């Protein structure tokens, strides 16, 4: 993996994972949006959001002797929204495509990351919802995992 130009770039962990997952879903013909997207959304689509959690305790000592957290717990939330009056298989297909992308995280997600490596990711919950007013089907799919900053990605100086 390449060396990051600076620490702020290296610590854009949530954005990096969201972008990698988004790229892979797009390759599977799944319309998706990052957590803070301002686009007008039309079903079917998937919202992608990553939240960084507690550091795992793995440290990296930089050139200034500062011990920096190098591994973090994270959660990946994917919200599928489909129109019930359209093709009913779309919702099921989106769920299956998401599971397939996540199942191959070692090769596909990590291959799309520049400075980070997903060490593990696990399905933690799926919750179906129904929006009666809009006739929308929604599923919230939750995954949890650990992401590491790659050893060779640390900047040369602070």
Identify the residue ranges that each predicted region occupies:
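Small/polar-rich, solvent-exposed N-terminal microdomains that initiate assembly or binding
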Residues: 1-67, 105-113, 154-158
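Acidic-leaning, charged glycine-interspersed low-complexity segments
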Residues: 46, 99-148, 156-158
